[in-house]
Structure formats: structure tokens, C-alpha cells
Amino acid sequence: MNSVMRNLGLSALAVAVLTSCAATSTETATPATTPQAYQVPLAQPPQVSQPLTLNQIMANPDWMGIFAKEAYWSDDSQSVFFARQASASPLRNYYQQGINDSRAVELAIDKLHAADQQFGVLDSAKANKAYLYQGNIFVKHLSSGKITQLTRQRTAISGLRYLNNGDIAYWQGDNVFQIHQDSGLVEQLAEIKMAKAPEGVKEPSSYLAKQQHRLIQYVALQQENAKAKEQFKNELQKSDPTLAANTWYLGDAEVVSELSLSPDGRYLFVALTDKNYTGSSEHDIMPNYLGSEGYIDPVPVRARVAEDNPPGQRFVVLDLNEHKQIDVTIEGLTGFDEDVLAKVKSENAKAKGESYQSTKAPRKIQLMQDWGWTQSAIQWHESENKLAVMVEATDNKDRWIASVDLAKGKFITEHRLHDDAWVNYDYNQFGWLPGTDSLYYLSEETGYSQLYIKARGEKPRALTQGKFVVSDITLSPDANYIYYKANQSHPGMYNVHR
């Protein structure tokens, strides 16, 4: 090994010397042809009898073969869809593999929209599936396979759901819409503007203004006309059923982080974040030495943990029927004001010869940030206006599952997970058991991710126990069974359980 490293060092030195000499030469050689882009050769796969080398391990993994990725079942469970990425290609190809076929069929690019989609939503009768493709809405009738495109626009739609009456609701930016299935009418349920509400026509307040209105008839007339127009506009909004709902003004200090609509379309749960928070600063950069222009590019990255100061989030419920805003308080979260770092701060103070006095203060709370899940931290009951959310403290010591009192704007703790070190950013799946008042969830309160169910107001019940990890929760279509993955037999072996 020392001999190899010495030879590499001498080779590098020789190259450096030759390069230096070339740089100081008075004659500049002009290439006869334009140099072609250099294609990095892939490492050759080793023979079975040969051990892996460091060069092989660190090489582009294409030498191992072209793997199937992101596989999922078709809607009729008779085939599997998956993607493959050709060697050294930045693009993916998509395939369909029938369970009784010997070969997979590559999907044509103009047929991708018609392929069964992994992340769709079903109506209450499980007869239709709505999904997003390239930011537009499609609906598939599952029994016939017929697909209908409902939108074709450049502004992408970010989410959708079926309402209890069979209509489709979707949100686009900070706007929420409903597509009426009987008529095709698109109704705007909510328009959220992050700005201060207009003040409307104001009465003169200063002495000078009042005299101006009293003495000059034209000024007084303009004031009365403005008030009349405003009154007519308000009366029209209340009386005319063909108009969209009034705009919501939530202030100019925040931005919408996430929103979610209730099953009947009445309530909108919104998470708001300080608009000035970016998660990084001008000092949080990483140099890219392979910039396309030949220079070192400063690439923005997230702030270091010790320097980041996330502001938390504010939560509101918008009652779309009553046009009423309800601010959600966090006092219902057990330990929301605990000084969870008191022990560490006390030790640090003692080392300095000082004393530390612990005090209670509200902690910063935000929706749970999970690195692995595809679900949302906001979970509505399948058919009722019952809401559960998963939130975390920005100090990373606590995670809560809380139900939400929509009328009063209060969190009610259903489960609290505390970790003196760091709450895991994985194993956080949760949701409602259909047709019940119970939640299912994963928790590492025993040190291992285990599965629990809990009825509101009652104690949780563990469905799994032991020194193994449970993950990937899936409910059966009839909700009578829960499927999960666990490494119960061996830490490196995962099996599916029911």
C-alpha cells in the first residue's frame, strides 16, 4: 500500500511539473480540432471470484446493473409499474410489468398520463380515482379504466381530495377550488392573501378633514358616493349566490406553509411561517468547484444546526361557511412550555461558576418534518370533520399527535413522544382508522418504533412489542387489517406482517 501511494504521489508530481513547464513556455500550441466532451468510463464489474476494490466501491453504481426503482402496484393489482435509468443517463424510462408476463413493456412518453398513478385519491365509493399528472387533474373510472382530464393549464395544482358529496376539491397556490361533478362548475372556495385587509371607506377624523367635508359640497358628495358603492358591493356579496367567497386576509408578516381542506369542504386548516425565514443565511454556502462557467460557484445550503433559529409556525382554522378565522392555540400540547434544556443549561452555568434558574415559556411549534414519508402531517378523518395533526418543537425534543377542536381552535394532546437527544425524523406514520374514532401511529417511546392505536380520550394500546423496528404502515381496503414491515427475526431482515 505504501508503495502504491508513493507511486501515485510521484506520478502526480510529474504531472504537476510538466504542467508547470507547459504554462511557462513562450510558445502556445493551437489544437487542430475542437476537443470533445470527456466521457468518464464506468468501472468494470468484478468477477465473482474477485474481491471488491475501493475503486469499485466508489465508482458510479451503474456497473452493478440497471435497477428497477419506485415500483408500485397497478389499480387492478395485475401489474407493477416501475422506472429504470439507463447507464450514464439523466433521464428515466417507465415500464409496466404484468404479473403473468415474462417481459416488461416500456411506456411511450405520450401515454405516461394514462399510466396508473401511485399517489391518487379515491372517492368514498372507491369507484373513481383522481390524481395529478404534470400539475393537472385526471380522473380514472376504475371499473372501465376510462380516464378524463379535468384541467389543462400551466400553473401547477399542488394537491387535491374528494369531498363527501363526490366533488373534487383542489388547491393551487393559496387558493382552494371545488369542481362540481353534476355541472362541471369550478367554484373558488377560498382565496388567501398574505396582506393586511383593506380598510374601506374611512370617515374624516382630523378637524381639518371634518371642516373640508362640511364646507365643500363636492368633497362631501365624493365621500357619500364611495360609501354607497362600498355598501352595494357588500350587499351584493351577501345576496348573489353566483359570486365567489370573500377573500381571506391573513396579514403581511407570514407565508402559507401548508393547507388542508376538511371532507365536507367547510374548514381549511392553515400553517403559517414567518416570511423572512429561509433556513439559511449569506454565510451558509458550499463551494462548487465544477461550476459550468469555470468559476467556483457558491451554492446556498441550509443553516448549521447550532446557528439555525426556526421561528415555528402559527396555525389557523378558516370556517368557509361562516367566513370566520379561528386562531389555534398550543396550550393543549402537554409540555408546550417546559424548559427541556434546563439540565444542560444548568450544567453549563455550573461550569462557569454561575447558577441557572429554569422558567416556563412557550416553545416554538411547527408541523412535523419527516424525511421519509409521503403523507402529510395534517390528517382529516375519512368522512367526518375530525382533524389530527403531528407537530414538533423546533428544539427537536418533542413530537405530538394532537386532535384539533375546530370550533374553539385548540390542540388536544393524543400522544407525546419526548427524547432528550433528538426526536427521529422517521417512523412517524399516523392516521385515522376508517369508520372509528381511533388513531393509529408509530412511536419510539420504548426505544424501538412500534405500532399503537388510540381512541380519543382513552389510553393507547400497543399492537406490537419488542426490540425490533416497525415501519411502512398500510391499511387493508376494508380497514380490518394493518400491514407493516418489521425486522423481528433479525436486524437486517425485514418481513411483511399483518
PLM feature segments, named:
Residues 1-9:
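Bacterial N-terminal signal peptides that target proteins for export
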